[in-house]
């Protein structure tokens, strides 16, 4: 049994019989199977690396780091986010399957940190790009604080309602693109045909200046659609 109490559990008279809802069962099954995508750009990420050792042992929480966003349900941003990296971060978040969560780790990620005063290329908070579930302040946060943030995220998941989560994410989504493939007929000549795969311009190809101007000029509802 997980260390976190089973959410909204109704027990019947026999001890061996448990009744609950499919939503609560889904939440409970995801508590110990968080697969994080580690997005580290600065010194805060070194503190997270301390959790890999036997002293803190983050494996006991079921955390399995993934190198692909399509296999992750948690992205942990640690370090400074520049305007040039902002489109790439949003693209990684959009590639993650539902349900997905975000932990903002460190002062530079949350507010821009010491780079937010004089730097023209620093994003003043990652929540301007993607919705954040847990804020973890510090410069840098200790490994114990990271474990506490993961525990708070698991408690939030245990009380979550799926429909409310999807509705909230659709309202807070900052930027999105549709990726479409065009399939055509060709002969096997050994040469790669660039015309076979057609994809609209992605966020990684958008200049940082144009990216932020587009966000300011268009409402959030238009961005989603």
From Swiss-Prot:
Keywords tagged on the record: 4Fe-4S, Chloroplast, Iron, Iron-sulfur, Membrane, Metal-binding, NAD, NADP, Plastid, Plastoquinone, Quinone, Thylakoid, Translocase, Transport
Catalyzed reactions per annotation: a plastoquinone + NADH + (n+1) H(+)(in) = a plastoquinol + NAD(+) + n H(+)(out); a plastoquinone + NADPH + (n+1) H(+)(in) = a plastoquinol + NADP(+) + n H(+)(out)
GO MF assignments: 4 iron, 4 sulfur cluster binding; iron ion binding; NADH dehydrogenase (ubiquinone) activity; quinone binding
Annotated signal sequence range: none
Keyword Translocase: yes
GO BP: any one term: photosynthesis, light reaction
PROSITE patterns in the record: COMPLEX1_20K
Cofactor(s) this protein requires: [4Fe-4S] cluster
Cofactor note: Binds 1 [4Fe-4S] cluster.
InterPro entries named in the record: NADH_UbQ_OxRdtase-like_20kDa, NADH_UQ_OxRdtase_20Kd_su
Chain residues that bind [4Fe-4S] cluster: 43-44, 108, 139
Protein EC: 7.1.1.-
Cellular compartment(s): Plastid, Chloroplast thylakoid membrane
Topology of this chain in the membrane: Peripheral membrane protein
Family listed: Belongs to the complex I 20 kDa subunit family.
PANTHER family the record matches: NADH DEHYDROGENASE, NADH DEHYDROGENASE [UBIQUINONE] IRON-SULFUR PROTEIN 7, MITOCHONDRIAL
Complexes and interactors: NDH is composed of at least 16 different subunits, 5 of which are encoded in the nucleus.
Biological role stated in the UniProt entry: NDH shuttles electrons from NAD(P)H:plastoquinone, via FMN and iron-sulfur (Fe-S) centers, to quinones in the photosynthetic chain and possibly in a chloroplast respiratory chain. The immediate electron acceptor for the enzyme in this species is believed to be plastoquinone. Couples the redox reaction to proton translocation, and thus conserves the redox energy in a proton gradient.
Protein known as: NAD(P)H-quinone oxidoreductase subunit K, chloroplastic
Top-level taxonomy: Eukaryota, Viridiplantae, Streptophyta, Embryophyta, Tracheophyta
Gene name for this UniProt entry: ndhK
């Amino acid at each position: 049994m997980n260390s976190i109490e089973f959410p909204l559990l109704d027990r019947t008279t026999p001890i061996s019989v448990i009744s609950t809802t499919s939503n609560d069962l889904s939440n409970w099954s995801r508590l110990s199977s968080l697969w994080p995508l580690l997005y580290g750009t600065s010194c805060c990420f070194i503190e997270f690396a301390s959790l890999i050792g036997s002293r803190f042992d983050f494996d006991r929480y079921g955390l399995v780091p993934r190198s692909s966003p399509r296999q992750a349900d948690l992205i942990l941003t640690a370090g400074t986010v520049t305007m040039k990296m902002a489109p790439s971060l949003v693209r990684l978040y959009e590639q993650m399957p539902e349900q997905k969560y975000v932990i903002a780790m460190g002062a530079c990620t949350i507010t821009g940190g010491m780079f937010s005063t004089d730097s023209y290329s620093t994003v003043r908070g990652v929540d301007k790009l993607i919705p954040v579930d847990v804020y973890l302040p510090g410069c840098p946060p200790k490994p114990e604080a990271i474990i506490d943030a993961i525990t708070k995220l698991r408690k939030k998941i245990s009380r979550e309602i799926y429909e409310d989560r999807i509705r909230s994410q659709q309202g807070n989504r900052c930027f999105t693109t549709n990726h479409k493939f065009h399939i055509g007929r060709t002969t096997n000549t050994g040469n790669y045909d660039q015309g076979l795969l057609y994809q609209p311009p992605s966020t990684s190809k958008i200049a940082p200046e144009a990216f932020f101007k587009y966000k300011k000029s268009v409402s959030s509802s238009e961005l989603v659609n």
